[in-house]
A protein has these predicted regions:
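Extracellular/periplasmic carbohydrate-active domains that bind, remodel
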Residues: 1-445
Length: 445
């Protein structure tokens, strides 16, 4: 059955609050047993819309939703820094099944207008970021919590106030042929955040954003119970951002496993592939990480990466003198058939108390370019700086590895192309690595 939002009071005039009309159409569709809620061409002003089970929200070509969301405090949440409201969204749902957002329309979060102050001229933690958000942004512009059989397909997603799509505790999710356009200098405008979800397929997405493009996390504290993030598959995507093209870990204590990424192009990202195991009992934003995620059984194949840094793997404590041990891990991770153009060396770092497990690299070509200083030539700091390393020139080796059990490089190569200054011809430097098989050829052009 088809339910036209304009028949329920929605007005395509870009000013009238059409939330009641949209919600009435969604509720009527659900009450009838499900179907399609149709959004005809035109501009609609919308506040928070909650989808129901068995409802597809379909945008006809020329249809556009523009956000009316405002900062709303999340009850019981205290934070010292600007943070987000995890219980508000523009379009989403909680504990629903068989729901979808589809069509050739546009969804505009108006993050710049509604949630960001003027350019303050400072450089914030992310590469090139110039804006710092207000408190209480909706964390996910499109958000689904503890739901199953969810689809988001074909729509153009613009200017989110925080994450563009956030799925937490969901099963059977498909994100297909999405176009994401978020301000490259905006704060925390991740594109696709997959958090404690299983059986997720991401394909054909074209992304530009001001934080991570694809982030796989396991924030069981936010979810409220232990649930792994597993069986995540991303392919045939184009990524551009001011942080990480693909990020695994950081927020969360749950397992991240059986994740696969293939046939992806990254163009001008800060870090190509980031993996992070951290503990942070309270970082001031409400994020609680007690022991760190266990990241295992993941593969990266046939990726083209243009990045400031190709790989950055970290084990971190916040604060650095936190007495609790890191018990999370990275193990059984495979990188195969990768081509990387990078302007500083990659960091593969465990911690003295918790080493990286097995990393396997096969047929990985790392091209290094640009002028390299001597900031880290004599001494690489520990902990290695994460977001604030931009003031230094970086690592002069293609790979720097410390505190790891087993690293294997098969048929890999390093090409120094228009690489000046203090680049080292030695392709890898290791510290406290139990085993390193380094079949890495080096060529200078």
């Amino acid at each position: 059955m088809m339910f036209d939002v304009t028949k329920y009071g929605a007005a395509a005039d870009d000013s009238t609050d059409s939330t009641p009309g949209f919600q009435a159409a969604v509720d009527a569709c659900a009450a009838a047993g499900g179907g399609v809620v149709d959004v005809p061409a035109g501009k609609y002003a919308l506040d928070m819309l909650s989808l129901r089970s068995n409802v597809e929200l379909h945008f006809e070509e020329g249809a556009e939703v523009r956000s009316l969301l405002k900062p709303v405090p999340q009850p019981g949440l205290k934070a010292k820094e600007p943070t987000a409201n995890t219980r508000r969204w523009l379009i989403g749902g909680e504990k629903i099944a068989n729901a979808a957002v589809t069509g050739k329309g546009r969804i505009d979060g108006r993050g710049f207008e509604l949630f960001w102050p003027e350019n303050d001229g400072l450089e914030h933690p992310l590469y090139g970021q110039r804006y710092w958000p207000q408190l209480h942004r909706p964390r996910g512009m499109i958000c689904f919590r503890e739901s199953r059989n969810i689809r988001v397909e074909d729509v153009l997603l613009l200017d989110p106030p925080c994450y563009t799509v956030w799925c937490l505790g969901c099963d059977d999710v498909r994100l297909e042929n999405l176009i994401v356009r978020a301000d490259l200098k905006g704060p925390n405008t991740d594109a696709l955040d997959i958090d404690c979800c299983s059986n997720v397929h991401i394909t054909g997405c074209d992304i530009e954003c001001g934080d991570d493009c694809i982030a796989v996390k396991s924030d069981i504290n936010d979810l409220g119970y232990d649930k792994p993030c597993e069986s995540v598959h991303a392919e045939h995507c184009r990524l551009r951002c001011t942080s990480c093209g693909i990020r695994l870990g950081y927020e969360g204590d749950g397992a991240i496993r059986n994740c696969h990424f293939n046939d992806i192009v990254m163009d001008e990202v800060m870090i190509g592939i980031s993996m992070m195991v951290a503990i942070s009992p309270d970082d001031g934003r409400g994020t609680i990480i007690r022991h760190g995620p266990r990241i295992t059984d993941c593969t990266f194949e046939r990726l083209d990466i243009h990045a400031l840094q190709g790989f950055n793997f970290q084990f971190l404590k916040n604060p650095e003198d936190c007495p609790d041990p890191i018990t999370g891990c990275m193990d059984d991770i495979v990188f195969r058939d990768l081509r990387i153009l990078s302007h500083r060396g990659s960091y593969l770092g465990g911690s003295p108390e918790t080493k990286i497990g097995k990393l396997y690299f096969e047929n990985v070509t790392m091209t290094l370019s640009g002028n390299m200083g001597r900031d880290f030539a004599e001494h690489v700091p520990y902990p290695y700086p994460v977001w604030n390393d931009l003031k230094w020139s970086g690592l002069p080796w293609a790979y720097y590895a410390r505190h790891a059990e087993s690293l294997t490089f098969r048929n890999c190569s390093v090409i120094l192309d228009r690489a000046f200054g203090s680049w080292e011809r030695e392709p890898i430097r290791t510290e406290n690595v139990a085993e390193c098989i380094a079949d890495i050829g080096t060529t200078r052009i």
